[in-house]
Structures are given as structure tokens and as C-alpha cells.
């Protein structure tokens, strides 16, 4: 019997700068949903990606002295590295510069044009380049006047200056779909979540009247061109939104994924783009005669005490720093526990450290440590088999375990992650209290209470197992460590379905002889200071401290190193290594194999076709049994590694001097 499918998407991110913790928030939330649904037995498809067209990208690339795709490839490598670091379990990564996407955008645009939903006109409005959005005069912030007429202002979204732009444009006649859209809302009351977003869409945008939408531009070239009128570039409203179906192969030679997974179960995004997903996207799908997604969920923003994150304010949080210092689980846990999903939440270093110390180290970590230590002390490490409830406290714990699963499931289905985690932690806290109530240290002094003591241990381990299973969507490491230390090796005991009945560990098991702390406690004062320091804006050139240099060398020393241009023609993972890739490079006169420690930052598909710099006169070496004949140059800063890419015009074998 085929599994029930579940298709979830994040927004596709605009790669004009480094991603911050707000972007990580959306993607981790999507990952939690995907892992939860897989744990329930669904056939899940999880999509994320990047929106890579537009004037802003064109200008950024020009400023960097690169082609658009060269600039984008570097930015996307950083995004993929962050997703890998966050252990995002996406099944696909769509780039709007990919042919599979552009092909769909072209066909969709021409179809809408042919059937009269798109028409040619002229557009004039106040345009913000960073936001890639037009605004009406009434929407502008800090409008500037001259002789009673508006001559400028700022974007209500970003605060950037706007400019008056007039250009020929194609328009999407969305106004004719107004009644049909409202009817869909009525028939599908849970389509937009939280409900407050639905009211906002109806009262602020639909009831005042939907204006037809400008869906092409002639003021820049970087994008998908309209096939029948190439001076026009398809604008973001169609280009970006179509990714959700282009990634499934819609209008391709193989539509099997589209037929299997569409419509999407959840489109996940931050609240500032809910309008595009709850108004424009449904109307676009109606025009294409396609089923509409089942749910659009708009979460809130991660705010700081002084408002939105901003580099100039010195309050931007880099998720890389949190992961590197405190671990992935602590970072993912904080994001999903502290911030109520669907509402705005405030990030504070104090709360991050407190959650790590009290919830993870004290409540969960100490429970695991105490339990294993008692089993080693009282039963020489062998956990007695579960015997059922022997007194009222056992019955109470078993009932609470089953009720916890029920409440957790209800919260997860409604995407209330902080509530789901709170439910699990109430159960963990109650289990800690159960130790104090049953007093194992007293029972151990009375041989007649040996069975009772053993059953207390069995209940503790079963409760910990319940918690570990429920935490699997959120924490990618701790549940595995808990199962390992408890020596629970049967995969079926790690599955969600195993929680339907309490007390499945009916055979004795040997726990680890020496429990290891899963979450070490943090020095609160020092770590709060560290996080605050990491949030400061970058130093100016005058403020930067000189980076210690290596000893100077003369030109003769440098001349000993031979560096040549090469193209990566093949790559694969080295077996039994999570760090190494085995790479084949073309040096024109020869091909070589190089083993490189970049697997945590790049997949094989990411690097095939890249032009790189190779040190060719290193002595051959063996790494994990694989011969390596050189070294590919890379750059590293703040724990992020990036390959040194060369312009494609440089021929293979060219010597770099």
C-alpha cells in the first residue's frame, strides 16, 4: 500500500546577502514538519531554494565585478552550507536560474497571455529596488513633497528610498478572480494560518479592490525573458511563485512528481510575503486550472529588544556562531521553543543560555544521566524488564505518557511547536519528580523492594524513550545519543508508532557503563557576553585589528608552489567519511584525483563543472585509502569554507602566478 504523501515548502530566499537567523527559523520549522511527518509514516517531499533574478542581483553582481551567475553560485554555496550545518532534510533545492524552472515560467506566461489573463500596458509607480516592489503614494513612509506634490519617500517594508518609475509592462488581470478567491476562502477556512492573516488579506487588500498586477519589467535584463516579447523580463510574482510546481516537473517530459505530490500540503513563509502566497499564487493557479495548496502558514518575525534585526543596529544573529559554539540541537531547540510560531518573538542572549542550561542540561540531560547512573549502581548496568504499573505513581506516569503523545500530536498538527515542546518538557519535569517520589536510594536498601526498584528504573527508561522519540523532529543529535547510552538499538522502538502502547521494553538491556553529558552547562555570564559581542556590527577598516601574519617568505619560496587552473569533472563521497570528497580534475594535459575535506560544505553535484585552482606539485598522499595528487585551494572564515573559483575563460592547465 502506497504511503500518504505530504509536500511542504519554504519560501525561496533572495541571495543578495548572507542569511541570518530569521531565514534559519523558516527553514528549521519546515524541517521539523518534514521530520515529524516522516516519523508518522508519510512520503514527504520538502522543498527549499533561491529566488535568483531581478535588478538587485544584477546590480550586486556588477558591483562585485562578476557575472550574475558567478555571484549567485558563491551566494548559493553559502546558503547550502548553512542548510547542511542546520541538518535540513530537504529533498530538493530549486534555483530559479535552472533550466527546469525557466522553461515552466516561459510556458506559464505565454499560456496566460494567450488566454487573456495577461495583457500589455504601461505602469508608473514608486519603486524600491531592494524590495523589488512598487508602492502607491499612500503606502510611502516619510513622503517628500514639493509644491504639494510627492517627489519621493521610503519603502514601508525596508525603509529604502523609492524612485518614480514608468515603463511598459504586462499586467495580470487578478481583479476578475476576486469573487472566486473569496469563495475559496469561505470553503476552506483553514487555508490561511494563523486566522489573523486571513482577516488582514481580506480587509486590507481584497475588499479595497485588487489592482491588476504588473508582471514584467524592461528596466533590467537579469531574469526569464518573455518568449514572444524578449525585451520584457518576467517579474517575481510569476517567476518566483512558480517554483513550487516547476520543482515537481510541471510541464516537463516527466510530471510524475507533480502528479504525486501536488497540491502542496503547506506553504511556509514569514508574514511579510503572505499576501503573495494567499492572493496572487491562488489566483495564478486558478488561471492555470490547477488545484490550490491546502494551507499557507505565515509565521512571525524574530525581533530583537530594539526592533527588527539590522546590521547597523548591531543586533543581527548569525546562526553559524550559535551552532559552532553551542551545538545544533541547542540552536534548533531555542528557535522552536522560545518563539511562538505564528507570532513575533524576541531573541535574547539571556533566554538562549537559560533554555540551554535549564531545559536541555538540567531537565533532560540530568534525567538521562541520573537514570543510567542508578541502573549501573543498583543493577550493574542491566535494566530490569518492565513489569507494568506496581503502584499509583506508575499508573499516573503511564497515563501521562499517553496523554503527552496526544497533546503533542495536536500541537504539531497545528504547527504550535513551542506548545508541543512545552508538553514534552512537562512530561520530563514530571519524570524527574517521579524519581524524588519513588526514592530509589531508599528502595535499594531493602532487598524485598528489589522488584519495585527495578520497575522504577524501567519506567524511567521508558519515559526517557518517549521523550527522545517526540524530540526527534526537533533535535537531530540528542535522541540518537540517548538511544545509544540506553543501548536501545531496535529501530522500531525509536518510531512514533511505538508510543501507542506504554512499556515495550520487555527484555533486559545493558545501558552504557559511563553516561556522558548530552548538554554541558554553560557559564551564563560569559556566554551571554559572547553572544552579545558576536551581534556587534563589523568593525570599520580603522577599527579592525591586524590579523597575525605567517612569517614572510621570498619569491623563491613562492616559486616552489605550482598552481594551475582545472575543471572538476567528477566527484563522490569517500566511504566511511563525512568530511572527504574524492574529486577528479581536468588539467588539460592530464586528469588527476584529489581528496579534499570539503564534504561538510559541498555536495558532489555542487562542484562538478567548477573551475578551481589546484596545487599540482604536492607529494601524493593517501587519505582513507584514496590516493590524492594535489590540493584544491579554498578560503575559510568564521568556520565557513568556500572554494576559490576561477573565471571560466581561464583554460585548464594555465599556470597561476
Swiss-Prot record:
List, alphabetically, the InterPro entries matched: aa-tRNA-synth_I_CS, Anticodon_Met, M/V/L/I-tRNA-synth_anticd-bd, Met-tRNA-synth_bsu_C, Met-tRNA_synth, Met-tRNA_synth_2, Methionyl/Leucyl_tRNA_Synth, MetRS_core
Q: Which reaction does it catalyse?
A: tRNA(Met) + L-methionine + ATP = L-methionyl-tRNA(Met) + AMP + diphosphate
| Enzyme Commission number, as recorded | 6.1.1.10
A single MF term (Gene Ontology): methionine-tRNA ligase activity
Q: Which is a Pfam family this sequence falls into?
A: tRNA_bind
Main localization of the protein described in the UniProt heading: cytoplasm
Q: Which domain of life is it from?
A: Bacteria
| Entry's transmembrane regions | none
Is Repeat among the key words of this record? no
Q: What class of enzyme is it?
A: ligase
Q: Where does ATP bind?
A: 311
All copies of domain tRNA-binding, residue ranges:
557-657
Q: Which UniProt keywords apply?
A: Aminoacyl-tRNA synthetase, ATP-binding, Cytoplasm, Ligase, Nucleotide-binding, Protein biosynthesis, RNA-binding, tRNA-binding
Where does this protein reside within or beyond the cell? Cytoplasm
One cellular component term (GO) for this entry is: cytoplasm
Motif placement: 'KMSKS' region: 308-312
Q: Which GO terms describe its biological process?
A: methionyl-tRNA aminoacylation
Keyword Lipid metabolism included in the entry's annotation: no
Q: Which CDD domains match?
A: Anticodon_Ia_Met, MetRS_core, tRNA_bind_EcMetRS_like
Q: Where is this motif: 'HIGH' region?
A: 13-23
Membership in a protein family: Belongs to the class-I aminoacyl-tRNA synthetase family. MetG type 2B subfamily.
User: What does the protein in this record do?
Assistant: Is required not only for elongation of protein synthesis but also for the initiation of all mRNA translation through initiator tRNA(fMet) aminoacylation.
Recorded hits in PANTHER family, A to Z, give: METHIONINE--TRNA LIGASE, MITOCHONDRIAL (PTHR43326:SF1), METHIONYL-TRNA SYNTHETASE (PTHR43326)
Q: How does it assemble?
A: Homodimer.
User: Which protein are we looking at?
Assistant: Methionine--tRNA ligase
Organism, by scientific name, is Staphylococcus aureus (strain MRSA252)
Amino acid at each position: 500500500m502506497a504511503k500518504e504523501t505530504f509536500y511542504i515548502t519554504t519560501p525561496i530566499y533572495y541571495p543578495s546577502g548572507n542569511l541570518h537567523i530569521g531565514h534559519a527559523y523558516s527553514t528549521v520549522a519546515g524541517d521539523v514538519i518534514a521530520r515529524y511527518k516522516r516519523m508518522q509514516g508519510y512520503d514527504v517531499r520538502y522543498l527549499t531554494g533561491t529566488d535568483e533574478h531581478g535588478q538587485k542581483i544584477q546590480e550586486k553582481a556588477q558591483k562585485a565585478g562578476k557575472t550574475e551567475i558567478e555571484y549567485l553560485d558563491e551566494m548559493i554555496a553559502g546558503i547550502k552550507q548553512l542548510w547542511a550545518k542546520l541538518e535540513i532534510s530537504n529533498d530538493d533545492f530549486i534555483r530559479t536560474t535552472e533550466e527546469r524552472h525557466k522553461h515552466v515560467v516561459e510556458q506559464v506566461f505565454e499560456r496566460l497571455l494567450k488566454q487573456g489573463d495577461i495583457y500589455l500596458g504601461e505602469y508608473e509607480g514608486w519603486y524600491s529596488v531592494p524590495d523589488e516592489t512598487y508602492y502607491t503614494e499612500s503606502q510611502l513612509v516619510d513622503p517628500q513633497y514639493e509644491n504639494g506634490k510627492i517627489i519621493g519617500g521610503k519603502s514601508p517594508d525596508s525603509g529604502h528610498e523609492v524612485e518614480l518609475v514608468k515603463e511598459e509592462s504586462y499586467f495580470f488581470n487578478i481583479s476578475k478572480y476576486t469573487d472566486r478567491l473569496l469563495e475559496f476562502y469561505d470553503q476552506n477556512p483553514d487555508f490561511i494560518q494563523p486566522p489573523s492573516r486571513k482577516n488582514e488579506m481580506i480587509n486590507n487588500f481584497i475588499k479595497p479592490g485588487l489592482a491588476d498586477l504588473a508582471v514584467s519589467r524592461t528596466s533590467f535584463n537579469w531574469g526569464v525573458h518573455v518568449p514572444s516579447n524578449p525585451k520584457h523580463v518576467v517579474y517575481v510574482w510569476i517567476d518566483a511563485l512558480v517554483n513550487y510546481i516547476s520543482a515537481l516537473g510541471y510541464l516537463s517530459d516527466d510530471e510524475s512528481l507533480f502528479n504525486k505530490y501536488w497540491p502542496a500540503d503547506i506553504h511556509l513563509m514569514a508574514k511579510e510575503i503572505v499576501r503573495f502566497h494567499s492572493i496572487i499564487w491562488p489566483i495564478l493557479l486558478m488561471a492555470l486550472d490547477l488545484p490550490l495548496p491546502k494551507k499557507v502558514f505565515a509565521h512571525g518575525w524574530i525581533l530583537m529588544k530594539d526592533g527588527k534585526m539590522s546590521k547597523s543596529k548591531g543586533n543581527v544573529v548569525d546562526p553559524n556562531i550559535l551552532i559552532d559554539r553551542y551545538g545544533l540541537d541547542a540552536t534548533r531547540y531555542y528557535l522552536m521553543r522560545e518563539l511562538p510560531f505564528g507570532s513575533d518573538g524576541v531573541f535574547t542572549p539571556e533566554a538562549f543560555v537559560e533554555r540551554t542550561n535549564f531545559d536541555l542540561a538540567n531537565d533532560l540531560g540530568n534525567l538521562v544521566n541520573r537514570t543510567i547512573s542508578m541502573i549501573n549502581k543498583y543493577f550493574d548496568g542491566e535494566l530490569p524488564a518492565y513489569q507494568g504499573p506496581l503502584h499509583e505513581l506508575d499508573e499516573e506516569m503511564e497515563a501521562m505518557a499517553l496523554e503527552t503523545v496526544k497533546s503533542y500530536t495536536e500541537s504539531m498538527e497545528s504547527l504550535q511547536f513551542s506548545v508541543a515542546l512545552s508538553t514534552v518538557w512537562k512530561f520530563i519535569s514530571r519524570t524527574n519528580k517521579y524519581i524524588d517520589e519513588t526514592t530509589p536510594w531508599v528502595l535499594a536498601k531493602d532487598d524485598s523492594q528489589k522488584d519495585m526498584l527495578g520497575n522504577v528504573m524501567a519506567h524511567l527508561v521508558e519515559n526517557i524513550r518517549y521523550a527522545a522519540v517526540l524530540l526527534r523532529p526537533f533535535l537531530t543529535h540528542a535522541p540518537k545519543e540517548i538511544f545509544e547510552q540506553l543501548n536501545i538499538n531496535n529501530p522500531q522502538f525509536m518510531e512514533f508508532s511505538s508510543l501507542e502502547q506504554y512499556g515495550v521494553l520487555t527484555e533486559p538491556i545493558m545501558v552504557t557503563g559511563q553516561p556522558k553529558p548530552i548538554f554541558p552547562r554553560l557559564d551564563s555570564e560569559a556566554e551571554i557576553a559572547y553572544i552579545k559581542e558576536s551581534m556587534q556590527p563589523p568593525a570599520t577598516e580603522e577599527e579592525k585589528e591586524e590579523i597575525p601574519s605567517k612569517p614572510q617568505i621570498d619569491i623563491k619560496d613562492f616559486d616552489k608552489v605550482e598552481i594551475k587552473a582545472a575543471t572538476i569533472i567528477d566527484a563522490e563521497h569517500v566511504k566511511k567519511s563525512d568530511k572527504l570528497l574524492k574529486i577528479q580534475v581536468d588539467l588539460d594535459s592530464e586528469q588527476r584525483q584529489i581528496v579534499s575535506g570539503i564534504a561538510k560544505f559541498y555536495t558532489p553535484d555542487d562542484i562538478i563543472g567548477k573551475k578551481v585552482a589546484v596545487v599540482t606539485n604536492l607529494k601524493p598522499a593517501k587519505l582513507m585509502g584514496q590516493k590524492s595528487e594535489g590540493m584544491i585551494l579554498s578560503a575559510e572564515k568564521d568556520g565557513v569554507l568556500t572554494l576559490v573559483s576561477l573565471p571560466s575563460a581561464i583554460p585548464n592547465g594555465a599556470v597561476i602566478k
